[in-house]
């Protein structure tokens, strides 16, 4: 397995597909990276030369991926919570951030249903 940005990418797949195993690289970014590195998109990872892998690593290093990207996202969310913006408050309370309704659904953010006992007659 070849290592790119600290991630073992699969050898049997095409390089464009293998690059998407790195956090922060999707299909369109992977195509741009391969194009910048002057490598054929149809090449399998096992068929790449060391020179081609080196060029791909150099291009990937110019992108923010893996730990750096995760750290930046966490810092952005913490900043929103510290300045007590509306989005930060929603993050703090574990509610949907982007304006979704919460009367019925939003179970992914709110967690399992907490049933409330009915008042007896």
From Swiss-Prot:
One of its GO terms (molecular function) is structural constituent of ribosome. GO terms for biological process: translation. The keyword rRNA-binding applies. Keywords: Ribonucleoprotein, Ribosomal protein, RNA-binding, rRNA-binding, tRNA-binding. Pfam families: Ribosomal_S13. GO terms for cellular component: cytosol; small ribosomal subunit. Residues 91-121 are annotated as: Disordered. It comes from the Bacteria. Part of the 30S ribosomal subunit. Forms a loose heterodimer with protein S19. Forms two bridges to the 50S subunit in the 70S ribosome. HAMAP family: Ribosomal_uS13 (MF_01315). Located at the top of the head of the 30S subunit, it contacts several helices of the 16S rRNA. In the 70S ribosome it contacts the 23S rRNA (bridge B1a) and protein L5 of the 50S subunit (bridge B1b), connecting the 2 subunits; these bridges are implicated in subunit movement. Contacts the tRNAs in the A and P-sites. Belongs to the universal ribosomal protein uS13 family. This is Small ribosomal subunit protein uS13. The gene is rpsM.
């Amino acid at each position: 397995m070849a290592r790119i940005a600290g991630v073992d990418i699969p050898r049997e797949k095409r390089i464009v597909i293998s690059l998407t195993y790195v956090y922060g690289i999707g299909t369109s970014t992977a195509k741009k990276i391969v194009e910048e590195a002057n490598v054929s998109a149809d090449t399998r990872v096992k068929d790449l030369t060391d020179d081609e892998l080196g060029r791909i690593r150099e291009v990937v290093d110019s992108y923010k991926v893996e730990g750096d990207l995760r750290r930046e996202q966490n810092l952005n969310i913490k900043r929103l919570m510290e300045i007590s913006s509306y989005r930060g408050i929603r993050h703090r309370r574990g509610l949907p951030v982007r304006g979704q309704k919460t009367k019925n659904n939003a179970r992914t953010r709110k967690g399992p249903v907490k049933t409330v006992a009915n008042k007896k007659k």
